[in-house]
Amino acid sequence: MNNNDYTIRLKSIRAVFLGLDGVGKTSILEKYLGIENIDDPYSTILSNDYSKKIKFDDLDYTVRIIDTPGRERFINVLRVYIRNARIIFLVFDMTRKESFLHLDRLLEMISENINNNKVMFVLIGNKADLLDKFEIKEKDAKKFAEILNAKFFLSSAKNSAISLNEFIDGVFQDYIKLYNERLDPDLLRREENINLERRNRRRNARPLC
């Protein structure tokens, strides 16, 4: 990202979940959002749009999360969902090699439509509890994440060893922290002057004893 991307205060975050059909995107989101539908076998046909409020450093933010369809025929539609995305979660199934290979196709689509340098990537390998069925080596997934400069998490939508919720919350908090660290200094000075002026007005408006 360049400095021109940090000229306004961050109030909301658009996050998109991408991945092949059946990798568990919806189940992961339902667990994170506390939705009771974990065992739903149906695939996402269009998209699901969720919203969640989070607090960081005493400030409130709105996170908009888009759960996208994973079927191959919908891949050209995904460009609509990734517009203005700040965080992209790439989800694959540790027991399905094709779902891991499909990430290259998704990254190609992403590169064709948005600037990769303007988003934070997150890689989630799902169904990590099915060790005897793994078709992807953990070291290969980690290497892929390193190439993307992405955060990496091994998850089971039903029994994560590490809290999935803490991981996803941490992703959003890290993005907010990164954004705020890069805010335009002129904006910070203007806000500081405005806040000082407001305090002076309140002080001057107090009745004299």
Residue ranges and their predicted role:
Residues Y61-I75:
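Switch II (G3) loop of P-loop NTPases
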